[in-house]
Design a protein with these regions (language model features):
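Acidic side chains
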Residues: 47, 57-59, 71, 84, ...
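Generic, ordered loop/turn and secondary-structure boundary motif
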Residues: 23, 68-70, 91-96
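Residues that define the transmembrane beta-barrel architecture of outer-membrane proteins
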Residues: 26-30, 66-70, 77-79, 119-123
Length: 131
């Protein structure tokens, strides 16, 4: 678990950021995980991590929403060989990692928030052989 407290002082910019948290500095973040050893060298891993909302940038006041991601791995391992079937973002959580605020659409070029979304659910296999 992490706690972070940031505070901008003496900042001169287009908007007033005095006494505001810095960009990409969530106040709370956490990660918890566990491994379960099954029979015959099989195992299961689960980890959950998340963060509270944060400001996208020091050039505007838009913020992300808090989010939590779950990852799962089912694997097999022996002395020389490891194989994992993994799923990242198990519940296919829709979340934003970056935010940009500017005018990009003619004719009025009104400032609009554009978000970069985090990765969707990913499923993969990792195989390792030690020789």
């Amino acid at each position: 678990m992490g706690f972070l407290k940031t505070n901008i002082k003496n900042w001169e910019s287009r908007i007033d950021l005095e006494d505001r948290a810095q960009a990409h500095a969530p106040e709370h973040s956490y990660s918890i995980g566990g491994n379960l050893n099954l029979k015959n060298n099989f195992y299961l891993k689960l980890d959950i991590n998340g963060k509270s909302s944060f400001y996208y940038s020091d050039s505007h006041d838009n913020q992300s929403k808090s989010y939590q991601l779950t990852n799962l791995t089912f694997g097999y391992s022996n002395a020389n060989f490891t194989a994992d079937l993994w799923i990242r973002n198990l519940f296919d959580k829709y979340y934003s990692t970056r935010g940009f605020f500017f005018g990009n659409e003619a004719p009025n070029f009104i400032d609009t928030l554009y978000r970069r979304q985090g990765d969707p659910k990913n499923i993969g296999i990792s195989i390792r052989y030690n020789f």
